[in-house]
Amino acid sequence: MRVKHKPWAKDRLEEFPAIYIKNPEDFKGQWHEVFGNDNPIHIEIGSGKGQFISGMAKANPEINYIGIEMIESVLVSALDKAIEVDVPNLRLVARDAKLLEDCFEKGEIAQIYLNFSDPWPKKRHTKRRLTNPTFLTIYERLLPKAGEIHFKTDNRSLFEYSLVAFSEYNMLLTFVSLDLHNSDYEGNIKTEYEEKFSAKGFPIYRLEAKFDRN
Protein backbone atom coordinates (compact mmCIF):
# COMPACT_ATOMS: atom_id res chain seq x y z
CA MET A 1 0.00 0.00 0.00
CA ARG A 2 1.39 3.38 -1.00
CA VAL A 3 1.75 5.83 1.85
CA LYS A 4 0.86 9.45 1.22
CA HIS A 5 3.92 11.58 1.92
CA LYS A 6 3.42 14.19 4.62
CA PRO A 7 6.29 16.70 4.37
CA TRP A 8 5.33 18.19 7.71
CA ALA A 9 5.47 14.87 9.60
CA LYS A 10 9.05 15.19 10.85
CA ASP A 11 8.47 18.67 12.29
CA ARG A 12 5.23 17.53 13.89
CA LEU A 13 6.94 14.58 15.58
CA GLU A 14 9.73 16.77 16.91
CA GLU A 15 7.19 19.06 18.56
CA PHE A 16 6.57 16.27 21.11
CA PRO A 17 9.97 15.18 22.50
CA ALA A 18 8.25 13.61 25.52
CA ILE A 19 6.75 11.02 23.15
CA TYR A 20 8.91 10.97 20.03
CA ILE A 21 12.53 10.00 20.56
CA LYS A 22 14.45 11.61 17.71
CA ASN A 23 17.83 9.99 18.42
CA PRO A 24 17.16 6.58 20.02
CA GLU A 25 20.82 5.59 19.62
CA ASP A 26 21.63 8.04 22.41
CA PHE A 27 19.68 5.88 24.87
CA LYS A 28 21.09 2.45 24.03
CA GLY A 29 21.25 0.60 27.33
CA GLN A 30 19.69 3.57 29.13
CA TRP A 31 16.02 3.38 28.25
CA HIS A 32 15.08 3.15 31.92
CA GLU A 33 16.17 6.79 32.14
CA VAL A 34 13.76 7.75 29.37
CA PHE A 35 10.84 6.19 31.24
CA GLY A 36 12.06 7.03 34.73
CA ASN A 37 11.67 3.46 35.99
CA ASP A 38 12.99 -0.08 35.58
CA ASN A 39 9.79 -1.60 34.23
CA PRO A 40 10.11 -4.12 31.36
CA ILE A 41 10.18 -2.70 27.84
CA HIS A 42 8.04 -4.06 25.01
CA ILE A 43 8.47 -2.89 21.42
CA GLU A 44 6.23 -3.12 18.38
CA ILE A 45 8.10 -3.22 15.08
CA GLY A 46 6.00 -1.65 12.37
CA SER A 47 3.57 0.24 14.58
CA GLY A 48 1.62 1.77 11.73
CA LYS A 49 -0.95 4.26 12.96
CA GLY A 50 -0.42 3.24 16.57
CA GLN A 51 -3.75 1.80 17.67
CA PHE A 52 -2.19 -1.38 19.07
CA ILE A 53 0.77 0.11 20.90
CA SER A 54 -1.33 2.93 22.39
CA GLY A 55 -3.95 0.45 23.53
CA MET A 56 -1.33 -1.78 25.12
CA ALA A 57 0.29 1.12 26.95
CA LYS A 58 -3.04 2.25 28.33
CA ALA A 59 -4.04 -1.27 29.41
CA ASN A 60 -0.68 -2.13 31.01
CA PRO A 61 0.78 0.83 32.94
CA GLU A 62 3.38 -1.44 34.57
CA ILE A 63 5.07 -2.03 31.20
CA ASN A 64 6.95 0.49 29.04
CA TYR A 65 6.15 0.48 25.32
CA ILE A 66 8.04 1.73 22.29
CA GLY A 67 6.38 1.88 18.90
CA ILE A 68 8.84 1.62 16.02
CA GLU A 69 7.84 2.69 12.52
CA MET A 70 10.34 3.62 9.81
CA ILE A 71 7.97 5.86 7.84
CA GLU A 72 7.52 9.24 9.52
CA SER A 73 4.38 9.99 7.50
CA VAL A 74 2.80 6.95 9.15
CA LEU A 75 4.32 7.44 12.60
CA VAL A 76 2.76 10.88 12.86
CA SER A 77 -0.64 9.16 13.05
CA ALA A 78 0.68 7.04 15.92
CA LEU A 79 1.73 10.28 17.58
CA ASP A 80 -1.87 11.50 17.48
CA LYS A 81 -2.99 8.25 19.14
CA ALA A 82 -0.30 8.62 21.82
CA ILE A 83 -1.39 12.17 22.54
CA GLU A 84 -4.98 10.96 22.82
CA VAL A 85 -4.29 8.18 25.34
CA ASP A 86 -1.91 10.45 27.29
CA VAL A 87 0.06 7.81 29.21
CA PRO A 88 3.64 8.10 30.55
CA ASN A 89 4.75 4.61 29.45
CA LEU A 90 4.72 5.10 25.66
CA ARG A 91 7.40 6.36 23.29
CA LEU A 92 7.72 6.41 19.50
CA VAL A 93 10.78 5.90 17.32
CA ALA A 94 11.32 6.25 13.57
CA ARG A 95 13.85 3.59 12.59
CA ASP A 96 14.32 0.66 10.23
CA ALA A 97 14.18 -2.70 12.03
CA LYS A 98 17.63 -3.50 10.63
CA LEU A 99 19.06 -0.78 12.88
CA LEU A 100 17.53 -1.87 16.18
CA GLU A 101 20.84 -3.03 17.61
CA ASP A 102 22.05 0.55 17.34
CA CYS A 103 19.19 1.62 19.61
CA PHE A 104 18.96 -1.15 22.22
CA GLU A 105 21.48 -3.05 24.30
CA LYS A 106 21.61 -6.83 24.38
CA GLY A 107 18.72 -8.16 26.48
CA GLU A 108 17.20 -4.70 26.97
CA ILE A 109 13.84 -5.60 25.39
CA ALA A 110 11.48 -7.98 27.22
CA GLN A 111 9.01 -8.60 24.38
CA ILE A 112 8.60 -7.90 20.67
CA TYR A 113 5.34 -7.52 18.75
CA LEU A 114 5.09 -8.01 14.99
CA ASN A 115 1.61 -7.11 13.80
CA PHE A 116 0.44 -7.38 10.20
CA SER A 117 3.91 -6.96 8.80
CA ASP A 118 4.40 -6.52 5.06
CA PRO A 119 4.28 -10.10 3.66
CA TRP A 120 6.72 -9.36 0.84
CA PRO A 121 5.20 -12.18 -1.25
CA LYS A 122 7.82 -12.28 -4.01
CA LYS A 123 10.57 -14.83 -3.45
CA ARG A 124 13.33 -12.33 -4.16
CA HIS A 125 12.05 -10.21 -1.26
CA THR A 126 12.07 -13.01 1.32
CA LYS A 127 14.88 -11.39 3.33
CA ARG A 128 12.72 -8.31 3.87
CA ARG A 129 10.13 -10.24 5.87
CA LEU A 130 10.34 -9.36 9.55
CA THR A 131 10.24 -13.05 10.47
CA ASN A 132 13.19 -13.90 8.24
CA PRO A 133 16.18 -15.48 10.07
CA THR A 134 18.19 -12.30 9.45
CA PHE A 135 15.77 -10.42 11.69
CA LEU A 136 15.40 -13.30 14.13
CA THR A 137 19.12 -12.99 14.80
CA ILE A 138 18.61 -9.34 15.73
CA TYR A 139 15.63 -10.14 17.97
CA GLU A 140 17.56 -12.88 19.73
CA ARG A 141 20.22 -10.38 20.74
CA LEU A 142 17.70 -7.83 21.97
CA LEU A 143 15.64 -10.24 24.08
CA PRO A 144 16.61 -11.84 27.40
CA LYS A 145 16.36 -15.58 27.86
CA ALA A 146 12.66 -15.47 28.73
CA GLY A 147 11.79 -12.83 26.12
CA GLU A 148 9.05 -13.53 23.60
CA ILE A 149 7.94 -12.59 20.11
CA HIS A 150 4.21 -12.18 19.50
CA PHE A 151 3.20 -12.24 15.84
CA LYS A 152 -0.18 -11.55 14.21
CA THR A 153 -1.18 -11.52 10.55
CA ASP A 154 -4.08 -12.08 8.21
CA ASN A 155 -1.73 -13.51 5.57
CA ARG A 156 -1.72 -17.30 5.71
CA SER A 157 1.35 -17.66 3.48
CA LEU A 158 3.37 -15.34 5.71
CA PHE A 159 2.15 -17.16 8.79
CA GLU A 160 3.15 -20.54 7.39
CA TYR A 161 6.52 -19.15 6.35
CA SER A 162 7.01 -17.73 9.84
CA LEU A 163 6.11 -21.00 11.56
CA VAL A 164 8.79 -22.74 9.52
CA ALA A 165 11.33 -19.96 10.03
CA PHE A 166 10.82 -19.93 13.80
CA SER A 167 10.98 -23.72 14.03
CA GLU A 168 14.12 -23.98 11.91
CA TYR A 169 15.70 -21.33 14.14
CA ASN A 170 15.01 -23.69 17.06
CA MET A 171 12.49 -21.37 18.66
CA LEU A 172 9.82 -22.68 21.00
CA LEU A 173 6.27 -22.03 19.83
CA THR A 174 4.26 -21.46 23.00
CA PHE A 175 0.98 -20.38 21.38
CA VAL A 176 -0.46 -20.86 17.89
CA SER A 177 -3.92 -19.89 16.65
CA LEU A 178 -5.27 -20.18 13.12
CA ASP A 179 -8.37 -18.17 14.02
CA LEU A 180 -7.59 -15.81 16.87
CA HIS A 181 -10.97 -14.12 17.14
CA ASN A 182 -12.74 -17.46 17.51
CA SER A 183 -10.28 -18.81 20.07
CA ASP A 184 -10.32 -18.54 23.85
CA TYR A 185 -7.40 -16.09 23.85
CA GLU A 186 -8.10 -13.12 26.13
CA GLY A 187 -6.71 -9.62 26.16
CA ASN A 188 -6.29 -9.15 22.42
CA ILE A 189 -5.95 -5.53 21.33
CA LYS A 190 -6.71 -5.04 17.65
CA THR A 191 -4.70 -3.08 15.13
CA GLU A 192 -6.33 -0.97 12.43
CA TYR A 193 -5.62 -3.68 9.85
CA GLU A 194 -6.97 -6.36 12.15
CA GLU A 195 -10.30 -4.61 12.49
CA LYS A 196 -10.58 -4.19 8.74
CA PHE A 197 -9.69 -7.74 7.80
CA SER A 198 -11.71 -9.44 10.54
CA ALA A 199 -14.75 -7.36 9.57
CA LYS A 200 -14.48 -8.94 6.13
CA GLY A 201 -14.51 -12.40 7.67
CA PHE A 202 -10.83 -13.21 7.29
CA PRO A 203 -9.24 -15.30 10.06
CA ILE A 204 -6.43 -13.75 12.08
CA TYR A 205 -3.37 -15.90 12.70
CA ARG A 206 -1.30 -15.49 15.84
CA LEU A 207 1.71 -17.11 17.46
CA GLU A 208 3.95 -16.61 20.45
CA ALA A 209 7.52 -17.87 20.42
CA LYS A 210 10.74 -17.62 22.37
CA PHE A 211 14.32 -18.60 21.70
CA ASP A 212 15.49 -21.97 23.00
CA ARG A 213 18.64 -21.16 24.94
CA ASN A 214 18.83 -24.22 27.18
Swiss-Prot record:
Pathway: tRNA modification; N(7)-methylguanine-tRNA biosynthesis. SUPFAM superfamilies: S-adenosyl-L-methionine-dependent methyltransferases (SSF53335). One of its GO terms (biological process) is RNA (guanine-N7)-methylation. Disulfide bonds: none annotated. Gene3D superfamilies: Vaccinia Virus protein VP39 (3.40.50.150). Its EC number is 2.1.1.33. One of its GO terms (molecular function) is tRNA (guanine(46)-N7)-methyltransferase activity. The active site is at residue 118. It comes from the Bacteria. It catalyses: guanosine(46) in tRNA + S-adenosyl-L-methionine = N(7)-methylguanosine(46) in tRNA + S-adenosyl-L-homocysteine. Belongs to the class I-like SAM-binding methyltransferase superfamily. TrmB family. Catalyzes the formation of N(7)-methylguanine at position 46 (m7G46) in tRNA. HAMAP family: tRNA_methyltr_TrmB. This is tRNA (guanine-N(7)-)-methyltransferase. It comes from Listeria monocytogenes serovar 1/2a (strain ATCC BAA-679 / EGD-e). The lineage of its organism: Bacteria, Bacillati, Bacillota, Bacilli, Bacillales.
